[in-house]
Amino acid sequence: MQIKHLITLFFLVLIVADQCSAFLSLIPSLVGGSISAFKGRRKREISAQIEQYKDLQKREAELEELLDRLPMY
């Protein structure tokens, strides 16, 4: 093999090994996150979501009102 092929192969193996080690270190956190999601520990409060939606609707109405008051150019 020529040296340029060996260098290319070396860098390819280096990149693949780095990506695999990064993926393997993520597995424990993925398992823990999926278990807590299935058990429902991270359920959001529906009332908080409703309040956020109402606030968003209010801001949107205020923005439309403000834009209606601006003169057209």
Curated annotation (Swiss-Prot):
It is found in: Secreted. It comes from the Eukaryota. Keywords: Amidation, Antibiotic, Antimicrobial, Cytolysis, Fungicide, Hemolysis, Secreted, Signal. Expressed by the venom gland. GO terms for biological process: defense response to bacterium; defense response to fungus; killing of cells of another organism. Residues 45-73 form a propeptide. Residues 1-22 form the signal peptide. The keyword Transit peptide does not apply. Has a low antimicrobial activity against S.aureus, E.coli, and C.albicans (MICs 120-160 uM). Has a low hemolytic activity (4% at 160 uM). Also inhibits the growth of two cancer cell lines on a total of five (the squamous carcinoma cell line H157 (IC(50)=55.9 uM) and the lung adenocarcinoma cell line H838 (IC(50)=52.5 uM)). Belongs to the non-disulfide-bridged peptide (NDBP) superfamily. Short antimicrobial peptide (group 4) family. This is Antimicrobial peptide TsAP-1. It comes from Tityus serrulatus (Brazilian scorpion).
